[in-house]
């Protein structure tokens, strides 16, 4: 797929509102020259996303990874939503986040975690979304893709191998069998069947003071907040170019 077209389709999702400075390969900190649009994606990242899409389209003809067949819709519906979450979860991108005093005090726990290599789990990863796009945005994370469907797990290994991604582990079993003594710093989950059951499983994987990020429909907002009272929820963020999708992030209390 044409790299310029991918960048154009993804731009609405990477445009962080306000005057925040994004220090990342994806969102450079240098201001754009007058009359020029910022280069939101590096050539390497565009190539990786393009290759990822090619693999996804090819495998999707054999196994059901997504009901979406149009490559451009795959970019907006899947990669756009995933990178929107990535920009908000890791606003420093490839840099190790530096917490301000205000952000430290907002964490509902007395201890501050080491953010040098956050442990991230993507539950029910399927086609690798949002986990792998988050990894492309924040390559310093250690990512675990949890997918019990063996064919989909094989696909995830193929993408990881082809893109030469490090610190990515594919766990081909149910999350309930995953041994996580200290939990994950971040767990991601997109809208799934049996939402109430699965979101409870996701919450149990989150370490104290860790985060749970849900890409869900607005109809599931109240349900998530009610089921998980042990989390301090941020205001939900509307996903661009969507009438009903939101990003909901909660911090787990110690």
Label for each model-derived stretch:
Residues 1-22, 36-93, 99, 115, ...:
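Class I SAM-dependent transferase core
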Residues 115-124:
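Conserved class I S-adenosyl-L-methionine
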Residues 131, 137-254:
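S-adenosylmethionine
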Residues 127:
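Conserved SAM/SAH-binding loop
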């Amino acid at each position: 797929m044409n790299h310029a077209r991918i960048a154009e389709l993804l731009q609405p999702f990477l445009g962080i509102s306000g005057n925040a400075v994004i220090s990342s390969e994806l969102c450079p900190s240098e201001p754009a020259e007058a009359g020029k649009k910022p280069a939101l994606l590096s050539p390497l990242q565009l190539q990786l996303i393009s290759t990822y899409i090619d693999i996804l389209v090819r495998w999707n003809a054999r196994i059901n990874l997504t009901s979406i067949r149009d490559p451009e819709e795959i970019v907006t519906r899947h990669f756009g939503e995933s990178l929107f979450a990535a920009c908000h979860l890791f606003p420093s991108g490839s840099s190790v986040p530096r917490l301000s005093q205000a952000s430290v005090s907002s964490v509902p726990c007395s201890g501050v975690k080491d953010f040098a290599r956050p442990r991230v789990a993507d539950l029910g990863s399927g086609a690798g979304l949002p986990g792998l796009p988050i990894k492309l945005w924040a390559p310093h994370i250690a990512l675990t893709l949890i997918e019990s469907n063996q064919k989909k797990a094989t696909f995830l290994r193929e993408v990881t191998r082809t893109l030469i991604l490090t610190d990515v582990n594919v766990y081909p079993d149910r999350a309930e069998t995953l041994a996580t003594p200290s939990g994950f710093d971040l767990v991601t989950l997109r809208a799934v069947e049996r939402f109430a059951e699965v979101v409870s499983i996701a919450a149990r994987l989150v370490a104290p003071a860790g985060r749970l990020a849900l890409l869900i429909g607005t109809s599931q907002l109240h349900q998530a907040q009610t089921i998980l009272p042990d989390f301090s929820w941020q205001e939900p963020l509307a996903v661009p170019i969507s009438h009903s999708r939101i990003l909901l992030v909660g911090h787990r209390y110690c």
